[in-house]
Amino acid sequence: YNLVSKANDQIEFSAGWGQTGVIGKLSLKFTNFSMKNFLNPKTYKGIIPQGEGQTLTLSGQTNGRYYQAYSISFMDPWFGGKRPNTLSVSAYFSKQTDISSNYLTNSGYGYGYPGYGYGYPGYYGGGYGYGSNYYGNYGYNNSYEYAYDPDKSIMMFGLAAGYGKRLNWPDDYFQFMATLNYQLYMMHDWDYFLVNNGNCHNINLELMLQRNSIDNPLYTRKGSQFMLSVAATPPYSLFDGKDYASMSSSDPDKYKFIEYHKWKFKAKIFSPLAPLTVKRTPVLMTRVEYGFLGTYNKNKKSPFETFYMGGDGMSGYSSTYAQETIGLRGYENGSIAGNGGYNSYGYAYSRLAMELRYPFLLEPSSTIYGLVFVEAGNAWTDLKNFNPFNLKRSAGVGVRIFLPMIGLMGLDWAYGFDEPNYGSNGKRSGSN
């Protein structure tokens, strides 16, 4: 039989207006793309060539003049055409700018003059409120939009190329993936962390071994997912002859070439609580995750690739360097690690969870299920302080909705039972 791949393209669009200007995101995902037929107009359906089951994703995001991000990725699940070997290539670029220092010193919250009256001087200033300030006159105004300072910026550029191969041993569910990554960070008067100016290069090789035996990616009733990965850069400090102990943390040359080794383990197990012949089978999902970021030289501890923990786990723009976002429902974003204070950088993390899922609708065109969960996790700035029993706990409820043209949407509400780590704003509950 001659089988023809069926397209399941997706488009994501959102737009709005905020105090920084236009806010929006546009993402196009073509799931039956054909690179081989790119120059063959007869194979085009719409604006792209189709027919080989390859995936092409284009994405753009903006938060006014303060943040823009663009990415493109290509994935061929049958590279070579004979075996399910995966080839992936991607590139991205983002730019974030800061606000003027005058705004920080001349604005405040609340009624009255900036930094005075019924309010207090905040890190991001007042913006809204009746009174006068550095950037406006009396009356209600939005000064944040006018505090834009293009001379303070961080730009990030990245490339990645990966190759994956399905293994026959120990069983057919195993897959091995190797990815070569390059990231360039270009900073100019970026005042938030150690490096304020200069360029930093991150060249690393990531090796990943995973096993996936789930029966359905949308509503999984049985099976498991295991993943073990390590990403490592060359150990520059072992052969470049530099005395990093005598270099200050703000010296751009200290982190010109970033070095680290990063280890991660993730596991999910799905257990049906009723016979699989029952259409609406409740499922118990258990999850375990650990992550560690190590160094070759104690005097060259990377501020990049650390763990940003807490909140919804959705990656977006921030004033920090490249960090891996780890969600912990029931706590504010970055309140466990990443928002400054004692846990500015997370070099180790642990996360455990149990979810009881029940399907309300299981149809080819849409899937809806609800869930209740308990979750616990924590992050540490030093590997020596890692303690898998010292965790921040939470519990909550949620819902997942899948629509073909939109994709998977989710809404969770959780309450955190423990105080966040020092340096956070202390908030624990809320929707994620």
Language model: regions and residue ranges:
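Gram-negative/organellar outer-membrane beta-barrel architecture
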Residues: N2-Y219, Q225, R329, L408, ...
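C-terminal outer-membrane beta-barrel translocator/porin domains of Gram-negative envelope proteins
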Residues: D9-T20, K29, H188-F360, V372-F373, ...
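Active/binding-pocket-proximal capping segment
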Residues: G18-T20, A91, V288-Y290, I368-A379, ...
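Hydrophobic alpha-helix feature that most strongly marks membrane-spanning transmembrane helices
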Residues: F33, F79, P272, I336, ...
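Alpha-helical scaffolds flanking conserved acidic
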Residues: Q54, T367-I368
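Secondary-structure transition into beta-strands, especially the periplasmic turns and strand N-termini
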Residues: L167-F174, P275-P282, E363-S365, G407
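C-terminal beta-signal and terminal closure region of outer-membrane beta-barrel proteins
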Residues: M314-T320, K384-N432
